[in-house]
Amino acid sequence: MALRTRLGELLRPLNSEYGKVAPGWGTTPAMGFVMLLFFLFLLIILQIYNSSLILENVDVDWASLGN
């Protein structure tokens, strides 16, 4: 038999929808939008590191991080 705790009783409503699937697309468009924003963030970071995107007073040098 499982141990019943106060925390378990508080969290039980969160697990009551187990196995059910939201109808339609659900939150898929929101997830896609967040993935797109994350991709753009990574792309900008890569361009800064590769010096493809030139920003004034931004040195891409490990030695400059210690100053």
Curated annotation (Swiss-Prot):
The keyword ATP-binding appears for this protein: no
Biological processes per GO annotation: photosynthesis; protein stabilization
UniProt topology in membrane: Single-pass membrane protein
GO cellular component, one term: photosystem II
Keyword terms, alphabetized: Chloroplast, Membrane, Photosynthesis, Photosystem II, Plastid, Thylakoid, Transmembrane, Transmembrane helix
Primary localization class, coarse: plastid
One annotated GO molecular function: phosphate ion binding
Subcellular location: Plastid, Chloroplast thylakoid membrane
SUPFAM superfamilies membership: Photosystem II 10 kDa phosphoprotein PsbH
Annotated TM spans: 29-49
Quaternary structure (record): PSII is composed of 1 copy each of membrane proteins PsbA, PsbB, PsbC, PsbD, PsbE, PsbF, PsbH, PsbI, PsbJ, PsbK, PsbL, PsbM, PsbT, PsbX, PsbY, PsbZ, Psb30/Ycf12, at least 3 peripheral proteins of the oxygen-evolving complex and a large number of cofactors. It forms dimeric complexes.
General function of this protein: One of the components of the core complex of photosystem II (PSII), required for its stability and/or assembly. PSII is a light-driven water:plastoquinone oxidoreductase that uses light energy to abstract electrons from H(2)O, generating O(2) and a proton gradient subsequently used for ATP formation. It consists of a core antenna complex that captures photons, and an electron transfer chain that converts photonic excitation into a charge separation.
Annotated PANTHER family: PHOTOSYSTEM II REACTION CENTER PROTEIN H
Stated family: Belongs to the PsbH family.
HAMAP family per the UniProt record, alphabetical: PSII_PsbH
The name this protein goes by in its record: Photosystem II reaction center protein H
Source organism of this protein record: Guillardia theta
Lineage per the UniProt record: Eukaryota, Cryptophyceae, Pyrenomonadales, Geminigeraceae, Guillardia
